[in-house]
From Swiss-Prot:
Catalyzes the NAD(P)H-dependent reduction of dihydroxyacetonephosphate (DHAP or glycerone phosphate) to glycerol 1-phosphate (G1P). The G1P thus generated is used as the glycerophosphate backbone of phospholipids in the cellular membranes of Archaea. It comes from Saccharolobus islandicus (strain L.S.2.15 / Lassen #1) (Sulfolobus islandicus). Pathway: Membrane lipid metabolism; glycerophospholipid metabolism. The keyword Zinc applies. GO terms for cellular component: cytoplasm. The keyword Thylakoid does not apply. It catalyses: sn-glycerol 1-phosphate + NAD(+) = dihydroxyacetone phosphate + NADH + H(+); sn-glycerol 1-phosphate + NADP(+) = dihydroxyacetone phosphate + NADPH + H(+). This is Glycerol-1-phosphate dehydrogenase [NAD(P)+]. GO terms for molecular function: glycerol-1-phosphate dehydrogenase (NAD+) activity; glycerol-1-phosphate dehydrogenase (NADP+) activity; metal ion binding. Substrate binds at D124, D171, H255. GO terms for biological process: glycerophospholipid metabolic process; phospholipid biosynthetic process. Pfam families: Fe-ADH_2 (PF13685). Zn(2+) binds at D171, H251, H267.
Length: 351
């Protein structure tokens, strides 16, 4: 395949360590980052982290803060209103996946740089140049701005709710399926397949898989392993110029569930369930994946997430329609109701 131009979007610098939030002014100086800043953060816990960041900004820095709870197009518009008022040099996204997605999409739309400062390791959006924003035509990732820099404080991430940490593991293990789907599309549809980016995504999944052996014993070491996997996955997407290395049929299932059951379930949790199901379809040992996830307290049954059997089955039957241009193990026609029900029961997602 001849491509005239392939642009790789990657962060300029990644800072990972313990208590490094106190060194933010040093990092900003190294990168030539100056105020005014627009700080996008969440409420409650993430706002407390944002306050600590503010305390350690360069002396006399000018800034404005906006708090958001969701990742909708309306939230993006709210950020853009403040952008017009403040005219910031850079955006700082301090929070979980929703905050960072809104920040990077607003940065993209307004041609601004942004710094990613995650407060939880819930998914690989902390690095990637793509965002999941509700209110667009479909619940899939859209092009956004890659972070200029990422500042990851392991002490902070280790204190995030365990459910968010587990969701990050579920999201990353899903790359096992994404890469297999990509290979399948290359073989059957002649789609471009990047060996290096696929290998990087697969390595991230294997790293997260190893994390399931460690996280219960040593939370800080486990979180460090997980964050490295999440960063690698995001880098793979930046290199590929698409979400292909990190999003396959397991993500299509997750997006389908989000259409049917839009509240109360974490993206990474749905990807974890989708990974178990799609591993079965690919002929991978799904039982090992399920058992590893279960041992860390990951919800491996639909009812644990408040999902009905019908929602799971319906999601499986419509998953292939979410991104019809993205060929996966689900094929062009998807699964019939009876096939979807059988697979969901065999993999113990439903009883």
């Amino acid at each position: 395949m001849n491509v005239k131009e392939h642009v790789i979007s990657l962060p300029r610098r990644v800072f990972v360590g313990h208590d490094i939030i106190y060194d933010i002014s040093i990092y900003f100086s190294q990168l030539g980052i100056t105020s005014p800043f627009l700080i996008v953060t969440g409420t409650k816990y993430t706002k407390k982290i944002a306050d600590r960041v503010i305390e350690n900004l360069p002396k006399n820095a000018k800034y404005e803060v906006i708090e958001i709870d969701t990742a909708t197009l309306d939230d993006v518009y709210k950020v853009e209103e403040v952008v017009k008022k403040v005219n910031p040099n850079i955006l700082l996204g301090i929070g979980g996946g929703k905050v960072i997605d809104v920040t990077k999409y607003a940065a993209f739309r307004n041609n601004l740089e942004f710094v990613s400062i995650p407060t939880s390791p819930s998914h690989d959006g902390i690095t990637s140049p793509f965002a999941s924003i509700k209110g667009l035509q479909k619940p899939v990732s859209v092009k956004a701005k890659e972070p200029l820099a990422i500042i990851v404080d392991i002490e902070i991430l280790s204190l995030s709710p365990r459910r968010l940490i587990n969701a990050g593991i579920g999201d990353t293990i899903g790359k096992i399926i994404a890469v297999r789907d990509w290979r399948l599309a290359a073989k059957l549809r002649g789609e471009y397949y990047g060996d290096y980016t696929a290998s990087l995504a697969l390595m991230s999944a294997k790293h997260a898989f190893q994390c399931t052996k460690i996280i219960n014993k040593d939370i800080k070491y486990g979180v460090r392993m997980l964050i490295e996997a999440l960063i690698s996955s995001g880098v793979a997407m930046g290199m590929a110029g698409s979400t292909r290395p990190a999003s396959g049929s397991e993500h299509l299932f997750a997006h389908a569930v989000e259409l049917l059951h839009p509240e109360g379930v974490l993206h990474g949790e749905l990807v974890g369930l989708g990974t178990i199901i799609m591993a079965y379809l690919h002929g991978i040992n799904w039982k090992i994946i399920r058992d590893r996830l279960k041992k860390i307290g990951f919800p491996v049954k639909a009812k644990d997430l408040g999902l009905s059997d019908e929602e799971v089955i319906k999601a499986l039957t419509i998953a292939h329609t979410i991104r019809p241009e993205r060929y996966t193990i689900l094929g062009d026609r998807g699964l019939t109701w009876s096939s979807a029900e059988k697979i969901a029961r065999v993999t113990k997602i439903i009883d």
